[in-house]
């Protein structure tokens, strides 16, 4: 099973679910370039497609032939791009099942928060430079449905800030524009996937919660949906047991 993290965090996102998932699957997680403990080159052209390339190269290096994939947030669209390549016969391995957690699968149903808008704009580098642990906590708590422990947020902040990670955030967040430009390709990737697709969504997420769930039901009526009441943008932190139950994995 591949576990694809979101923005602006890292594969540490999966820590609460790791013990249960590892009892059922051989797990593979990595920090994509610009995230977590991976390199954060300033001159790199960050994109969702480049992140999909990284995952494709990794899977090939591990000799994996068939995989299930769970993704969140930014990772959702990395998975959409991998599915698009699979539909085109260009993916050198087989995705058998895909599970999506809260993320902007459909740009028209996604509502970025203020910090995302500021990072995306012309003052993004200044905003990133002035960011702090306190502001990070405020942003993360604004999109959560359940309380987030300060120690956990501290770990995530340390991984984000590692190797001057704040400096590349304005570059990476251009993925929001990339989603808009590739909306048709990545929506079609889901509609033409021909494999089981499942969306697990926390309904208290102001970015990609109920609106994404409603859009999923309209565009993908034959695919499954689980709504976790009271959870926000990070159901894998806030309600790991609910996510595992939705995935039919014993917690």
Name these PLM-found stretches.
Residues 65-110:
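Conserved hydrolase catalytic core segment
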Residues 1-37:
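Conserved HGGG/HGGXW glycine-rich cap/lid loop of the alpha/beta-hydrolase fold
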Residues 193, 199-201:
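Short beta-strand/loop motif that positions the catalytic acidic residue
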Residues 152, 186-187, 195, 209-218:
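Short alpha-helix in the alpha/beta-hydrolase fold that links the catalytic acid
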Residues 106-109, 130-191:
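Conserved alpha/beta-hydrolase catalytic His-Asp/Glu region
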Residues 228-244:
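Catalytic histidine-centered segment of alpha/beta-hydrolase-like enzymes
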Residues 28-71, 84, 91, 245:
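Active-site loop/oxyanion-hole signature of alpha/beta-hydrolase fold enzymes
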Residues 204-208:
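Acidic catalytic loop of the alpha/beta-hydrolase fold
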